[in-house]
């Protein structure tokens, strides 16, 4: 005789979500701001539903497979432990699966790098009854998602059983992104339930820490539009200027009440074609991110342009001056992964046995989001020195191309943006150090 499991979910799922969870809709879209607990709610509901059907399987998907372990896999695992049913499961990582020891049904996890592969997925025990597309905005289009979804919804299930699909995401800023236009269409359709939640809907105690709420209020005070997007999940549009220039705080000198914990550099190189720049940035004990120095060489308009070997020597000498001035060696040196940047890297290695770390670039809008996120914390400073004027001027002048704003692929104006790129590579490469990734 199976032991009965008693679960009180009311202590874990905020009342806001009752309507979407108890809805009979087979497609449930949970969107909203960061900290709304929507992903936690879905994971708890999936585990509870899974336990009620001994033949049910769950397929959880992200766009890219290498994001699974530290996101949806751990999220489902967390829900299982929260519900005190971990003794029923075996946790596997190669491939990622969480298997019910009693009957062999499981939570399956997959990237959708190639939707065609999932179309031919076979489940040996039972049937796929629940789907979850997490971070839906990362997918390229609804067609990509629907190709996978339809592969499972078309299959015959026992009487009374249906495939239920969950979708969760934070809305992008751009109203012309496919997902923002798509959701307005889906919420009008029968069989669909669209829910929007924010951190303000988290009414149960001991879920959001006071430190997190303080962080939200800091962002709200520093950049209200960013707060509306990040934490309220509003589609605020892109505007024309990319950064709020007031969030780059000038300093006459390095603060007496703070200390450098680590030094970083960020580089964008164009060599003989366009400008090469490198930034020296400090992370301090008080979590400030301070741009200390800027190297900038622009060959445009010069008759005699520097060769890669000359730029390599410039950088080597400049970096040594920075090390001497600030009394620290660099913790990490980040650079673009473009061909020209590797050319400079090869020159540095040939002359000085030195390599840079070439970042795995994401979409431009995502790299910009990282910087905007950092700026919204109010922790970005720069030394107001002559050499840093090119840095602050380019950040202030950084613009979207107006001809691309009303599209799902907005582009920046690629002029005088080299320090912007260098700063983006540096931030992308150090998200965890800068408290932007947990």
Regions found by a protein language model. Give the residues of each.
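Walker B catalytic acidic pair
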Residues: 134-136
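Walker A/P-loop NTP-binding motif
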Residues: 39-53
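Conserved Walker A/P-loop ATP-binding site and its immediately adjacent core
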Residues: 56-76
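Pre-P-loop entry segment of helicase/translocase ATPase cores
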Residues: 1-27
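ATPase catalytic-site recognition across NTP-hydrolyzing enzymes
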Residues: 204-270
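Inter-Walker segment of RecA-like/P-loop motor cores
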Residues: 69-127
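Mg2+-dependent endonuclease catalytic cores in nucleic-acid-processing enzymes, primarily RNase H-like
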Residues: 289-412, 431-434
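ASCE P-loop NTPase helicase motor core
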Residues: 138-214
């Amino acid at each position: 005789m199976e032991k009965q499991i008693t679960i009180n979910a009311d202590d874990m799922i905020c009342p806001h979500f009752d309507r979407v969870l108890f809805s009979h809709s087979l497609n449930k879209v949970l969107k909203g701001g960061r900290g709304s607990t929507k992903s936690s709610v879905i994971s708890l509901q999936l585990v509870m539903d899974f336990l009620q059907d001994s033949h049910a399987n769950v397929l959880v998907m992200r766009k890219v497979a290498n994001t699974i372990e530290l996101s949806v896999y751990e999220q489902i695992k967390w829900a299982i432990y929260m519900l005190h049913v971990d003794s029923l499961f075996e946790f596997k990582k190669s491939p990622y699966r969480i298997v019910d020891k009693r009957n062999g049904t499981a939570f399956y996890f997959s990237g959708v790098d190639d939707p065609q592969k999932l179309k031919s997925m076979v489940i040996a025990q039972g049937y796929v009854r629940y789907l979850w597309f997490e971070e839906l905005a990362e997918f390229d289009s609804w067609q990509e998602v629907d190709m996978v979804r339809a592969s499972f919804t078309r299959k015959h299930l026992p009487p009374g059983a249906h495939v239920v699909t969950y979708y969760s995401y934070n809305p992008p800023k751009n109203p012309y992104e496919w997902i923002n236009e798509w959701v307005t269409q889906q919420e009008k359709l029968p069989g669909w339930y669209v829910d929007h939640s924010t951190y303000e809907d988290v009414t149960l105690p001991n879920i959001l820490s006071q430190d997190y709420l303080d962080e939200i209020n800091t962002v709200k005070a520093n950049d209200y539009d960013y707060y509306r997007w990040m934490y309220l999940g509003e589609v605020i549009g892109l505007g024309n200027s990319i950064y709020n220039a007031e969030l780059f705080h000038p300093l006459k000198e390095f603060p007496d009440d703070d200390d450098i914990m680590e030094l970083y550099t960020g580089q964008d190189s164009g060599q003989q074609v366009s400008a090469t720049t490198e930034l020296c940035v400090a992370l301090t004990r008080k979590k400030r991110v301070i741009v200390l120095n800027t190297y900038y060489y622009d060959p445009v308009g010069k008759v005699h342009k520097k060769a890669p070997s000359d730029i390599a020597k410039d950088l080597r000498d400049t970096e040594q001056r920075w090390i001497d001035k600030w009394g620290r060696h660099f913790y990490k040196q980040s650079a673009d992964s473009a061909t020209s940047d590797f050319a400079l890297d090869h020159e540095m290695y040939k002359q000085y046995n030195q390599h840079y770390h070439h970042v795995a670039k994401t979409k431009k809008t995502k790299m910009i989001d990282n910087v905007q996120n950092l700026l919204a914390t109010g922790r970005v400073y720069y030394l107001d020195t002559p050499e840093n004027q090119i840095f602050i001027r380019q950040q202030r002048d950084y613009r979207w191309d107006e001809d691309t704003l009303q599209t799902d692929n907005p582009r920046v104006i690629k002029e005088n943006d080299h320090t912007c790129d260098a700063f983006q590579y540096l931030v992308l490469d150090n998200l965890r150090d800068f408290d932007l990734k947990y």
